[in-house]
Amino acid sequence: MLEKNKGKIIQILGPVVDVRFTTGKLPKLLNALRVELPTKEVFTFEVAQHIGDDTVRCISMVSTNGLRRGLTVEDTGKAIMVPVGKQVLGRMFDVLGNPIDELPLEEGGEKSSIHGPIPTYEQQKTTSEILETGIKVIDLLIPYAKGGKIGLFGGAGVGKTVLVQELINNIATQHNGLSVFTGVGERTREGNDLYYEMKAAGVLDKTALVFGQMNEPPGARMRVALTGLTMAEYFRDKQNQDVLLFIDNIFRFTQAGSEVSALLGRIPSAVGYQPTLATEMGALQERITSTRSGSITSVQAVYVPADDLTDPAPATTFSHLDAKTVLDRNVAALGIYPAIDPLESSSRLLDPLVVGQEHYKVAQDVINILQRFKELQDIIAILGMGELSEEDKKIVARARKIRNFLSQPFTVAEKFSGIKGSYVKLSDTIRSFKEILNGNLDDYPEDIFRYAGSIDDVIARYKK
């Protein structure tokens, strides 16, 4: 057996560790290095830079508390390897692929490097197919592409995580699909809640959970998205599955990269972000795609700092997305959830060649009415409804019904709202909005359109 390449720690600066290899054989960039203390505690670093004088600069994936200069470091000879395949379903892992649900992992299971190749053009699939989510506002106005990348944009507390949880629930229960949930720099409580909610809903055995929470070092938060992606890629490439990859929150991935960049001494670029922002984002996003063997559909929650969409972090994410779902505080203030702004959100799939002529026409009519309603808001605020023409009054009444009807009770929020969650098929969604647009429900009060499933629920409420 070959003797392992070993070095010694010569400097520790927070999560940055410098290691000198006297053998003259430096580990490659992105290799994983290990330190094991007599207490059996294991530390893992990733090589980030060769800084000269036989020394490598590494980023630690765990807290460096307990380390000291002079400790022996071992080069594993490969990148960070994480478990993949059936063994990860129903389980919860950290960035290094160690189980954190206090259950054992099978010995000798398959593992893959977190730094996988980007699929070539020949391997990629080029046709577009819609993924039905059962959420009316999404399916009608911002349809998601199977194998596409979707961004959920919103400030703090507008409902990004609840929307992600509902999507996981709907895909598992209605489509029997596999999901990988990656918690990047978010609250530990949310991960804990998600685990037990999914267990209670019976969808945990179709999901792998990977967490690098906000209390962990920046190295873990920067790499945990790649750990989740590696697990999803295995299902796509080796088991020919259609997989959903949820990343909550992609902004924290950028934020962790910014911290690491500063620790490595790089000069920051705009707004203090790392100069390699676009490169790091591209390396992650380009691996998320449909291939001839299967697809990875990615839903990424994107925190928008100070609700500013021009901030470099959300702006860089925008360029990779097929659909953007914008959650708006003003919609949430009206008590309408999911708090999606239908006029700010968009999808490249809303095209008659993809969704069909009927769906496209209904969606455009809904958008036109909501746009006209927005234009009339100032007149209504200053002069009141009485100054509007009869045609505009009709548009306002229908727009308010549509706005209320775009709300929907979620299964994962049942215990908070007390309203039974609903999954609405795309055909029912189109039929329901057609009824409102045609004026068949003009006599109905607008309040009964709130938190209904399909239009049949509204009619049943009216008849009561």
From Swiss-Prot:
It is found in: Cell membrane. Gene3D superfamilies: 2.40.10.170, Bovine Mitochondrial F1-atpase, Atp Synthase Beta Chain, Chain D, domain 3 (1.10.1140.10), P-loop containing nucleotide triphosphate hydrolases (3.40.50.300). It comes from the Bacteria. It is a peripheral membrane protein. The keyword Transport applies. One of its GO terms (cellular component) is plasma membrane. It holds the Pfam family ATP-synt_VA_C. Its EC number is 7.1.2.2. It catalyses: ATP + H2O + 4 H(+)(in) = ADP + phosphate + 5 H(+)(out). GO terms for molecular function: ATP binding; ATP hydrolysis activity; proton-transporting ATP synthase activity, rotational mechanism. ATP binds at residues 154-161. Keywords: ATP synthesis, ATP-binding, Cell membrane, CF(1), Hydrogen ion transport, Ion transport, Membrane, Nucleotide-binding, Translocase, Transport. Belongs to the ATPase alpha/beta chains family. F-type ATPases have 2 components, CF(1) - the catalytic core - and CF(0) - the membrane proton channel. CF(1) has five subunits: alpha(3), beta(3), gamma(1), delta(1), epsilon(1). CF(0) has three main subunits: a(1), b(2) and c(9-12). The alpha and beta chains form an alternating ring which encloses part of the gamma chain. CF(1) is attached to CF(0) by a central stalk formed by the gamma and epsilon chains, while a peripheral stalk is formed by the delta and b chains. Produces ATP from ADP in the presence of a proton gradient across the membrane. The catalytic sites are hosted primarily by the beta subunits. This is ATP synthase subunit beta. It comes from Mycoplasmopsis synoviae (strain 53) (Mycoplasma synoviae). The gene is atpD.
